[in-house]
């Protein structure tokens, strides 16, 4: 695990709160991951506090699924996470806004499948902390 990830986990009290920047709790087999918020990893984005959010692996995968399917919704979620990064804490209002976007995505794409025929919205993607 990168040092910035550890530092952010402490600063944002991820373990104490029991949820990540998208309102997901740690599930069996999940790990803590660093998500690039402003400058993507593919564009050489730094692993720096100002450019990151801490996500568990399952919601991190889900966020990139949303990015590929509905870029506007991805941007809405990212905007809320940037706001929390700037504030320096996980704000319940931002988390509820993220949950609203995720719920809307799940309504719009319910039953959708990938090009390979796999379910787009896995069951574990819908298991979020009730805030």
Question: In which residue ranges do the predicted regions lie?
Answer:
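Short microdomains enriched in Cys/His and/or Lys/Arg
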Residues: 40-55, 77-91
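Short Cys/His-centered divalent metal-binding micro-motifs
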Residues: 52-76
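Short flanking/linker segments adjacent to small metal-binding domains or redox-active Cys/His motifs
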Residues: 84-131
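Short cysteine-rich loop/turn motifs with clustered Cys
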Residues: 2-33, 56-58
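Broad structural signal for hydrophobic residues in well-ordered alpha-helices, predominantly aliphatic
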Residues: 12-13, 74, 86
């Amino acid at each position: 695990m990168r040092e910035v990830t550890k530092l952010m986990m402490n600063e944002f009290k991820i373990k104490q709160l029991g949820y990540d920047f998208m309102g997901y709790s740690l599930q069996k087999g999940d790990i803590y991951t660093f998500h690039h918020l402003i400058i993507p990893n593919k564009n050489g984005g730094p692993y720096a506090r100002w450019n990151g959010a801490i996500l568990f692996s399952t919601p991190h995968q889900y966020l990139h699924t949303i990015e590929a399917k509905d870029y506007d919704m991805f941007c809405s979620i990212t905007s809320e996470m940037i706001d929390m990064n700037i504030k320096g804490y996980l704000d319940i209002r931002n988390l509820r806004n993220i949950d609203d976007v995720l719920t809307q995505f799940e309504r719009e794409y319910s039953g959708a499948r990938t090009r390979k025929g796999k379910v787009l919205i896995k069951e574990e993607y819908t298991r979020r902390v009730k805030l």
